[in-house]
């Protein structure tokens, strides 16, 4: 009888565990994952391009990953770019985001509790555009001119260094804080004399309403921008398993980009959902390695790029104090995802100079 009683007790215990544990796990999962992106497409479209996070959004990969769990994915594409993303983190309204180097550095230096989870892009090209009928032929000609840049963004940091290269500082121009879509309209109407931005200026040039007077393609990478995938430290600590799945999905998007290395046309076509042109993406990425530039690895090159940018941001007065980059990095989720997906050999780690090891 006692043996039979013990069997019933074990059976009932098994039923309780089977019911209670999944319910407890479900109760501990978030109802939604709040994703942020520093920018919008043409006409404020909620879409972006150029990296794995943007590609993951366009392909609906994160939604597919969490659909079976009933966890919603809420994306915020912000006209205010990097500073607007930091504002959401400051108010605990965001869980993960792509973020350019300067705004993420500013956020960390000012005390935001974020962690860097994966690389996203290096050597992002910067362009300087002027109206088509402008007499300006060089960045050196911008002294005293009305120059637009989205302040607090990765482009802003690059702009400061590009101006220096031509003997100028921000004080030598009339620097106007202006997001991309507004700057595009202002170039067309002649309300500004020049603007710093990305490959979107190539499409405007092709329409015959602007000229590109400077571009970083093929030049010194110190004038280019970088971005990473970061997360809210509170969310990461509370939901490590969810964080692991998010990072794994980012990695899957990066793998898809790497697989298009030899024939990137499907990537450019996908990215046109932003409203920017296929031709502008193709030109911007000509002679560039998509696999190299969108590597998710947190390797010595990413360390070197960000340590340099932290120093430059301090030198140019964009942050008041620096911080230890190593303490910001949280590589365990990326490393676990690389092992799980057996992708340890897909991307070669790059040394401090940017050369692939091996």
Regions found by a protein language model. Give the residues of each.
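Short, well-ordered beta-strand elements
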Residues: 29-54, 71-77, 144-148, 174-176
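Short, polar/charged alpha-helical segment
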Residues: 41-72, 109-110, 162, 305-308
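Secondary-structure end/capping motifs
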Residues: 43, 238-322
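Short helix-initiation/N-cap motifs at beta->coil->alpha
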Residues: 75-87, 100, 168, 173-188
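Flexible hinge/capping segments at coil-to-helix
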Residues: 131-146, 237-240
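Pocket-lining segment of extracytoplasmic ligand-binding domains
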Residues: 176, 182-274
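Conserved C-terminal helix/tail region of periplasmic/extracytoplasmic solute-binding proteins
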Residues: 311-358
């Amino acid at each position: 009888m006692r043996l039979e009683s013990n069997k019933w007790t074990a059976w009932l215990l098994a039923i309780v565990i089977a019911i209670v544990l999944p319910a407890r796990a479900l109760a501990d999962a978030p109802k939604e994952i709040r994703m942020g992106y520093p920018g919008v497409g043409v006409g404020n479209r909620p879409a972006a391009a150029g990296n794995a996070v943007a590609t993951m959004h366009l392909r609906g990969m994160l939604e597919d990953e969490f659909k079976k769990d009933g966890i919603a994915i809420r994306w915020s594409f912000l006209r205010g770019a990097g500073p607007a993303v930091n504002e959401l983190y400051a108010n605990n309204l965001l869980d993960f985001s792509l973020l350019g180097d300067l705004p993420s550095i500013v956020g960390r230096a000012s005390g935001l509790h974020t962690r860097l989870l994966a690389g996203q892009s290096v050597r992002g090209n910067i362009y300087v555009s002027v109206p088509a009928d402008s007499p300006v032929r060089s960045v050196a000609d911008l002294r005293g001119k009305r120059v637009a840049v989205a302040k607090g963004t990765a482009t802003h940091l690059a702009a400061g260094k590009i101006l220096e290269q031509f003997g100028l500082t921000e004080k030598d121009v009339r620097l106007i804080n202006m997001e991309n879509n507004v700057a595009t309209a202002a170039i067309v109407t002649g309300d500004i004399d020049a603007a710093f931005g990305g490959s979107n200026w190539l499409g405007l040039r092709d329409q015959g309403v602007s000229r590109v007077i400077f571009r970083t393609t093929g030049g010194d990478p110190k004038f280019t921008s970088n971005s990473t995938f970061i997360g809210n430290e509170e969310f990461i600590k509370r939901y490590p398993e969810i964080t692991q799945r998010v990072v794994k999905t980012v990695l899957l998007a990066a793998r898809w980009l790497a697989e298009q290395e030899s024939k990137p046309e499907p990537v450019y076509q996908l990215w046109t959902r932003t409203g920017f042109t296929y031709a502008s993406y193709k030109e911007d990425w000509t002679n560039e390695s998509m696999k190299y530039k969108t590597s998710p690895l947190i390797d010595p090159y990413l360390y070197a790029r960000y340590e340099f940018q932290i120093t430059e941001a301090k030198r140019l007065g964009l942050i008041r104090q620096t911080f230890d980059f190593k303490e910001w990095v949280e590589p365990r989720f990326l490393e676990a995802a690389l092992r799980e997906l057996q992708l340890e050999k897909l991307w070669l780690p790059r040394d401090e100079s940017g050369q692939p090891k091996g």
